[in-house]
């Protein structure tokens, strides 16, 4: 990686992107262009290949398009590659129109997800910066409020910040009564009391990240409780190849519960999680290779999507990737 950093300008001059290719758990380093078989005992988890920048971007997007055409009845939502198997819940509809803002209530969290792309802190550690962050976001809301249709309430874990959530929602609703709010949660604290608190605030949509606790049954029970209380219930998880089997194993249960939508996020690699993902083949070079495509994550999205269509599950499956904004990395 240091060698790549030192030679970055030289690579750009040659119109070449040095691509770090994902290591797959089968022992194959996969790229849309070639498969490189490596011994299971080989400790090298990535390989660097010279690749023309334009070819890489075009070829990967073409490969995603080929995955899409294998799935009948996909809905296209804008000029890019945002797709779903059915109609979107209101929060996602608003997002595709770029009419929403993300409101981070705090940085504290009670989970420790290896894939989390945000800087979060333990639930028992107070952080004065949280207050200043919320104040800055309220100012941003007032600057943009005329154009906004919805606000997503995130963290950290929002259910650790219920007083702040209530105050923030009340402030924004005072100036924009018709706003649609949706809350993200890892589901650990989603008991009847807290869910009832959110419903009483007029929250119309809740999203569970089941991957945070590796799809444990007690979180599925909390999800089922939420289904009885909210108009829109979404499961939103990263397409994380390491957890693919766990996700596939609970799809039938999600259909029984009656969720409205399964959002499959593209796995994001940032300075907050690269140290946890390095051992799985995701390398910190991603931070300066601006156009790297996490192809394995996108491929998993369409494999799961196709399976859900073939099984006839009632919920919409949505590809929530960076492509929906027409940009990458």
Please tell me what each predicted stretch does.
Residues 82-93, 97, 114-115, 141, ...:
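Conserved N-terminal glycine/acidic-rich loop preference
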Residues 90-132:
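Canonical Radical SAM [4Fe-4S] cluster-binding loop centered on the CxxxCxxC motif
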């Amino acid at each position: 990686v240091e060698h790549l950093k030192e030679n970055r300008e030289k690579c750009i001059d040659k119109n070449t992107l040095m691509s770090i290719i994902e290591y797959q758990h089968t022992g194959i380093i996969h790229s849309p262009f070639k498969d490189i078989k490596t011994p299971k005992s080989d400790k090298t988890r990535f390989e660097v290949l010279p690749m023309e920048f334009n070819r890489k971007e075009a070829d990967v997007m073409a490969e995603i398009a080929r995955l899409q055409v294998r799935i009948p009845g996909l809905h296209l939502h804008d000029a890019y590659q945002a797709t779903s198997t059915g109609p979107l819940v209101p929060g996602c509809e608003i997002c595709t129109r770029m009419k929403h803002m993300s409101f981070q209530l705090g940085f504290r969290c009670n989970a420790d997800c290896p894939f989390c792309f945000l800087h979060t802190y333990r639930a028992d550690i107070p952080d004065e910066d949280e207050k200043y962050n919320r104040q800055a976001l309220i100012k941003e809301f007032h600057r943009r409020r005329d154009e906004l249709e919805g606000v997503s309430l995130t963290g950290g874990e929002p259910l650790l910040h219920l007083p702040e959530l209530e105050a923030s929602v009340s402030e924004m609703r005072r100036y924009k009564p018709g706003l649609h709010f949706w809350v993200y949660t890892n589901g650990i604290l989603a008991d009847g009391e807290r869910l009832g608190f959110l419903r009483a605030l007029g929250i119309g949509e809740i999203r569970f990240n089941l991957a945070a606790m590796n799809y444990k049954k007690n979180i599925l029970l909390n999800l089922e409780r939420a289904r009885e209380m909210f108009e829109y219930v979404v499961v939103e998880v990263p397409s994380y190849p390491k957890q693919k089997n766990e996700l596939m194993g609970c799809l039938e249960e999600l259909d029984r519960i009656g969720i409205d939508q399964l959002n499959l996020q593209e796995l994001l690699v940032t300075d907050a999680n690269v140290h946890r993902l390095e051992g799985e083949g995701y390398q910190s070079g991603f931070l300066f290779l601006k156009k790297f495509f996490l192809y394995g994550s996108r491929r998993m999205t369409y494999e799961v999507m196709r399976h859900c269509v073939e099984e006839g599950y009632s919920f919409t499956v949505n590809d929530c990737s960076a492509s929906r904004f027409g940009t990458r990395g």
